[in-house]
Amino acid sequence: MYFRVLLTPSSAMFDSFSFVRRLSYSPDLGRRIYGHVLPSHDQIHQRLLEICLGQCKLFKSRKVFDEMPQRLALALRIGKAVHSKSLILGIDSEGRLGNAIVDLYAKCAQVSYAEKQFDFLEKDVTAWNSMLSMYSSIGKPGKVLRSFVSLFENQIFPNKFTFSIVLSTCARETNVEFGRQIHCSMIKMGLERNSYCGGALVDMYAKCDRISDARRVFEWIVDPNTVCWTCLFSGYVKAGLPEEAVLVFERMRDEGHRPDHLAFVTVINTYIRLGKLKDARLLFGEMSSPDVVAWNVMISGHGKRGCETVAIEYFFNMRKSSVKSTRSTLGSVLSAIGIVANLDLGLVVHAEAIKLGLASNIYVGSSLVSMYSKCEKMEAAAKVFEALEEKNDVFWNAMIRGYAHNGESHKVMELFMDMKSSGYNIDDFTFTSLLSTCAASHDLEMGSQFHSIIIKKKLAKNLFVGNALVDMYAKCGALEDARQIFERMCDRDNVTWNTIIGSYVQDENESEAFDLFKRMNLCGIVSDGACLASTLKACTHVHGLYQGKQVHCLSVKCGLDRDLHTGSSLIDMYSKCGIIKDARKVFSSLPEWSVVSMNALIAGYSQNNLEEAVVLFQEMLTRGVNPSEITFATIVEACHKPESLTLGTQFHGQITKRGFSSEGEYLGISLLGMYMNSRGMTEACALFSELSSPKSIVLWTGMMSGHSQNGFYEEALKFYKEMRHDGVLPDQATFVTVLRVCSVLSSLREGRAIHSLIFHLAHDLDELTSNTLIDMYAKCGDMKGSSQVFDEMRRRSNVVSWNSLINGYAKNGYAEDALKIFDSMRQSHIMPDEITFLGVLTACSHAGKVSDGRKIFEMMIGQYGIEARVDHVACMVDLLGRWGYLQEADDFIEAQNLKPDARLWSSLLGACRIHGDDIRGEISAEKLIELEPQNSSAYVLLSNIYASQGCWEKANALRKVMRDRGVKKVPGYSWIDVEQRTHIFAAGDKSHSEIGKIEMFLEDLYDLMKDDAVVNPDIVEQGSLDCV
C-alpha cells in the first residue's frame, strides 16, 4: 500500500524522474508497485530482491537484480506500464522525467519507443546522449554520427559524455576523419586536456591506427587517469607494438597509478601475444578477484598458444572460484578440448552449457558441433545442430566443416543446398524493404550488394524488386544505373515510370524527363496524379509553358485536372511562367478551395502583383479557409520593398495572433528576409533575438546575408562569430556569405580562418565557394592564396573562376600574371565575357601595355562580338591617359559616341593631373562637375590644378562652391592586418595610437620621393598632397 500511496496524484512524495530512472535497474520494484502478478524466472532471486528492497538495502538489491535473467525484458514491461500511468495521471513528460523515459527505452534497445518519446521532448544534451548511446549499442554508427551532427545543428552543446559516445563509434568504425572533426570541436570547447575526453580521443586514434596521434593527445592530458593509460597501451597492442605497450604499462605503475581491471586484462593479453606466458600468469596471480573476462583471456590465450591442457586447467580452476562461465568461456574451452580430442571433458563442458542455459546459444552450439566433429562424433554434432531452432551462417559453416573434416562430402553438398533453399527465406518483399532502406540512407554500396544477391536468386525480373532497384539507384545518385535497370525491366507500371521521371526532375534533367513522359504515354500507360505533378514541376523549372499546356490537356483527358494535387501543380506552373490569368482559371475550376491550392495561387500573385495576393488572402479568410505557415511565409516574402514594410509588419502581427510561431525555419527566415530586404534592420535584429536557441544555420546565414546586402559588413561578421560561439557549424551558403564580407572588409585573417574551417570540416569546394575564396584572397591582396585555390579546383569550366583570378592579378598590380591567365583561359576554350576583358584592360593600364591594350580592345569587339561598355572605354582612357597619350584619350572618348558619363571624364581628369595638362584637366573637371555636382573628387582634383598653377583665388572660390553645395570629401579608408590585429585608417583621421611614428615615417618617405623626383617638391611643400 505504501507504494500505491506514492502513485496517487495528490502525493507530493512522488518523484517521477527518480522512479522511472530506477526502472532500468529494478523492474521488480515497479512490478510490486503496480501489483501485477508477473512470474519471475527465478523465485529465489525474486524473494531476495523483495527482502533487500524492503530493508532499503539498495546496493544489495542491485547486486541481486544484476544476477536476475531477462531483467531488461521485465524492465521494459514495467517501464511501459509506468509511462502509461504517468500519462493517465497527467504528469508532465518533459524535463528530467522525459529524459528518464528516453533513457529507459534506449537501454532496453526499444528504438521506436525511444525515438517517439525523444521527438516530443524539448531536447537537452541528456536526451541526446541517451539516443546516441542507444544507436551505438544497437550497432548503428551512421545514426550516431548523423545524430551528433543534428545535435550541433540544433545548437545543443555536447558534454564529455556526448564526445565519449561518438568517439567510441568513430573508433569502432575507424572513421578517423570524423574523429578529427570532433577533436577540433573539443579543442574549441577546451575539453581536449580533460582526462575523460582525452582518454576517449586516445582510444579513437589508437583504434583508427593513428598511434602517434594517440600518443600526442595523451601527452597533452593534464592528469591522465587509468583509463587514459589503458587506452594508450591498448593502442600500442593494436598497432602491433606490444613491447611499447608493456613499457607504457610499466611507466604507469612507476608513476604511482594503480592499474584497474581492464589494464590488467589488456597487459595479460599482451604478454600472451608476446609469448610471455609465465609473465601473464604472474600478473594474473596479482589480481585479487579476477572476473570472467580475465579468466577468458587466460583460457583463450593459452589455447591459442598451443597450451590446450593449461587452458582446460584454467577453466576448471575458474569453476572452483565460483565464477560463472559465459559463451566465450565455453567456446574457448571447447575449442581446446576439440584439439586434444578429449570427448569425456567435452561432455562435461556440454553439461555445463545445458546447466547455464547456453546450449541453445548459436556461438556455443557452433563450438559444440566443432568439438564433436573433431572427436569424430558427427551424430552428436548433428543432434546439437538439429536441436537449435535458429541457425546462422556460422552454425551452418561449422556443420559443413565438420562433415568435410570427417570426409562426408555428400553431406557437405546436401547441407549446402539445405542452407540455400531453406536456411534463409528471403523473398521479393524482403528485398523490397531492404532496398528501400538503402535508398533512404543513400547507401549505394549495400544496395549494390543486395542487387548482386537478387541477380543470383533470379529475382531481378520481379516488378516490385525492379521498381525498388530503380528507386534505390536513383536516390543514391546513380541515375545511369537506375536507367539501365529501367530499360532492362520486362514489365513496368505507373510506379516504375513515376520513379524514373521523378528522378530526372530531381536531377534537373528536364529534357530527359519530358522524353520519358512522352514515351510513357506512347506505351499506353495512363498517367496518374503523381506523374503529372512531377512533369509539371519540370515545366516550372525551365519555364516550359508549351510543355505545361500539353500536360494540362492530358490531365483534362485523364480527368485529373480537378484533382487537388494536379490542380495545385498546374497553378504553380502557370504562375511561375507568368501566366497568372490561366492560373486563376485552374483555381476556379477546382471543386473546392483548399489551403494547398490557395497557397499556390497566392505564391503566383506574390511574384507578380502583391496587391492581388493580399486581396486573395482576405478572400481566403472570408471563405473560412485557415491560412497555414506556408501561406504567411509566401506572402511575407513578397513584402520585400521598403514601401511594403508596414504591410509586412501587419502580417507579422497576424502570424502572432493566429498562434503561429516564428521559430519555424521557413516562417522565421521569411520574416527576417522581409525585414532586411525592406531595410528594417532594427526589426530584423529584434525578431532574431526573440527566437529561442538553438537557432538553425539557415537563420544565422539569413542574418549575415541581410546585413551584408544592406552594407553592414562588420555586423555580418559579428553574427558569424556569434554563430560559431554557439556551436553552429556553417554550411556552404554560410561560407559564401561570410567570405564575401571578408572581401569587402579586406579581412584576410578572418578569410583564412574560414578557409581553414572549410578544410577541417571536409566540405567539398564547389565552384561557387571556390570562386568566392579566389575573390576574397585577391581583394585582400593575397594572390598566392587566390592562385592556390584556383589550381586546386577540380573543374574550371566556369568563366567566373577565371575572371576572379584575372581581376585579382590586375587590381594587385600583377599585370603579366593576369595576361598569362587570360591566354590560358583562351587555350582552355573558355569563352571570355565583358568582365574578363575589363580585368585584362585594367592589367594593361597598370603595366603601361598600351599596344597590348589596343589589341585586346579590338579583339573584344571584333573577334568576340562584345559591345564596349562605359567601363571598358573608361579603362582604355585610363590606359592611354596614364601613360601620356592624352590627346588620343580625348579623341577616343569622342569616337565612341557614348552618352556622357562621369567615369570617362574622371579617368581623363586623373591623367591630366598626373601629366600636368592643366588646360585639358580643367575642361575635364568642369564636365565632371556638370555631370556629378555632388562628386567631391572632381572639386579636389580641380582645386589641385588651380593650386599647381598658383591660382589660389580660383582654388578658394572652388572650395566656397563646395561648401555652398554641401559637397563633402568622402574620406578614404584602409584596413591593414598586423600581428592578428586589424588597423583601420581614415583620411584626415589622426586618432591612431601610433600616429606620431606614422607621421615621422611619412616625412621620411616624402624626403625620399623628393630626392628621386617622384613628386614636384613645390607641391609637397605647399601641402597639396593632403588634398589627394
From Swiss-Prot:
User: Which gene produces this protein?
Assistant: PCMP-E88
Family, similarity comment: Belongs to the PPR family. PCMP-E subfamily.
The protein in question is named Pentatricopeptide repeat-containing protein At3g09040, mitochondrial
Give first and last residue of the transit peptide: 1-30
Q: Provide a GO biological process annotation.
A: RNA modification
Q: Which domain of life is it from?
A: Eukaryota
Keyword Mitochondrion present in the record's keywords: the answer is yes
Localization: Mitochondrion
Show the GO MF annotations: RNA binding
The Gene Ontology CC terms held by the record are: mitochondrion
